[in-house]
From Swiss-Prot:
Assembly information from the UniProt record: Interacts (via RPEL repeats) with ACTA1.
Source organism of this protein record: Xenopus laevis
One BP term from GO: actomyosin structure organization
Protein name, entry field: Phosphatase and actin regulator 1
InterPro entries: RPEL_repeat
GO MF annotation list: actin binding; protein phosphatase inhibitor activity
Function: Binds actin monomers (G actin) and plays a role in the reorganization of the actin cytoskeleton and in formation of actin stress fibers.
Sequence motif: Nuclear localization signal, positions: 62-83
Family recorded in the similarity comment: Belongs to the phosphatase and actin regulator family.
Any matching Pfam family: RPEL
Annotated stretches, region: Disordered: 373-414
Compositional bias annotation for Acidic residues: 397-413
Amino acid sequence: MAASSEEETDRRPIRRVRSKSDTPYLAEVRISLNLETAEEVERLAAMRSDSLVPGTHTPPIRRRSKFATLGRLFKPWKWRKKKSEKFKQTSAALERKISMRQSREELIKRGVLKEMYDKDGDLHNEEGLMENGQAVSSGSSSLPIITELELTSMAGDTCAYEVLPTSELMDGTVSEDLSSEPGSLSQDPSYKPAMLLPPKKTVGFPVDQEDTPVKQITLLKQPPALPPKPISRIANHIADSGAPVKLPCMPGKMSPPLPPKKVMICMPLGGTDFPYGPYSNQKSSQHHHTVLPSQLAAHQLQYGSQHFSTGSSSISIHPSIPPGCRVIEELNKTLAMTMQRLESSGLHGGESITKSGLSGYCDMRQVPTVVIECEDDKENVPHETSYDDSSCLYSRDEEEDDDDDDDDEDDDSSLYTNSLALKVLRKDSLAIKLSNRPSKRELEEKNILPMQTDEERLESRQQIGTKLTRRLSQRPTAEELEQRNILKPRNEQEEQEEKREIKRRLTRKLSQRPTVEELREKKILISFSDYVELADAQDYDRRADKPWTRLTAADKAAIRKELNEFKSTEMEVHELSRHLTRFHRP
């Protein structure tokens, strides 16, 4: 029975299945033919191998493609696996770091974070925590009411960074004194909160050789703030009001670190002092140092330390200078020198204008200023007169020459106006130089030009005339030149004879010129392009297919006859191949 079943399976026609080169061919064959053992599969593969004679039932043998070995070398599916492994590793490391992060309560217990108190003494819990330099927001989008920066000084005094409302900034009324003690929070719901950028790091300034605990910066919870606008945009809002504007100071990376009581003093844009009466007296009496916004921007570019955002926040720094801050004074001096060097190229011409009385080109106007107030530590401040004298070394009356626009066209307009002003300055300086040119009388008075009367001028001219006539009289005449054989005497007849002689000589040369045939005989002219022959011809219609251009039957017969004669007589052909020559029909 078993033998008969095997014969039956052998007699069945072999199905056309996948080729032998494919990997899962054994499983498919086993499923399709209901084979159970491996021996039967191998036997079937041997029947379907190359040694099998292809008959009616055997499928055609497939050839392996030339790209079959490419998978051994080029395996791009493994690259994705490597990338996914890297992503898994980084995600696992991030999850591990997040799980190891401590909560806010633990940081408060350890003393890293400090709880904030209201004015009444109630505990005010923070809602936002600074993580990795950005404020973490947990669903609520309330703006920060106030931001306080507490810094430790030598005597424990603080420098409070307060926020002014935008309504006061727009009206131009800014309170000059501090509204609250440093360290306290003002939570007044009447005014509009100000937007502030989140700082990159919490900053604690080191104290000179003291182990006092460093207070951390505390920030209320806030959404991601918009990028700050340039400082020059506030100028048009507060240009008419005479009140000084308190610009903000954002905490950031301090390099180099400055003590909190140091007054940042920058050189002004203008190179000369412009005393303006009551405004300058008011500033000197209040011990205020003004800093222009362009200088603040230059200071920010140079040190990269203090980020001034143009929201409606204010800075109030105690200007009492500790005795051990010589290094920072030197830094401020170098800052002032660099600012003066940068601004001197475009503003050194302005001094000449003011000296010559052309003061109409400068638009003197009041500008927004940073007010640095003096409150505490008054015993370290020197006397009023000496303080004013020392501040005059670094602070001067700043006035802007150009108006700034509200939009992003501020820089372009300032550049345009600066270039226009420089152009006008160049023209005016040229006019001034021409107007300052000394007259002839001044030159004569300075003995640069000799003093001459009219008679002396006439005498000098007569002397020059006599010299010229003497030189012309010394010139040789034509007779003298003829005697020296330099100038030959000529008559008209002689000149005409000379011209005739030249004509004869030329005609003789042209008549003796050889013709083309003579040159061909002498083999001087080799190719036809060496000479040109002219022939007279009548104009005719050069278009073809005319009745007189068509060949008639007689013309064609004559042409055939001429060709046959040429082939029979003039074409030299071997006698053995003469029978192969084709002649045209007559």
